[in-house]
Amino acid sequence: KSIICSRVKGVYSEINALLAGTADAETQAKYAEVLDQLPAMKELYAHRARLRKERGCIDFESGEVKLILDENGHCIDVKKRTSGESEAMIEEFMLLANQCAAHFARVKQIPFVYRVHEEPNGEKLERLHSLLQACGINDHFAKEVPTPKELSAILEGVRGTPFEQIVNTGMLRCMSKACYEEKPKGHY
């Protein structure tokens, strides 16, 4: 059981405006209690993002969409959802909180449920290999499981190209689903 005490009910778009320096006086007043903490949070996020990149963590584009509804609640449009720096910061801090909780439980030998992501299986990797070959991308891992760093390099290589979305989706489908177990088995 956990309790989260929020001092401010934050809204991503408002936090993004504060981070960008474009927030109006009303928004700044709403966040006065935490405003001076935002630069340190931004710096911590940037540091964690650098560490993640150095480790070769895979950074998938989510491709989330939002539904635009009319006054009757009927969908009239679908738009790609964009996220700003505040969403990325919160996601990073939630991951860090989970890692700290898991580490604490392991060190103190407290029973715990760990989130486990196993490496991709052979069949899914074969499909990814075929997709990459069809896109003219040499993957160098036809016979073995690639490291996350290798997959990350492929994603980085297609960023901004016509292949970006299909490779991102193909790689995401290749990943094993996360499961929860009593023993920490690591995270691919």
Give the location of each predicted region.
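Conserved, carboxylate-rich catalytic/transport cores that coordinate ions
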Residues: 1-188
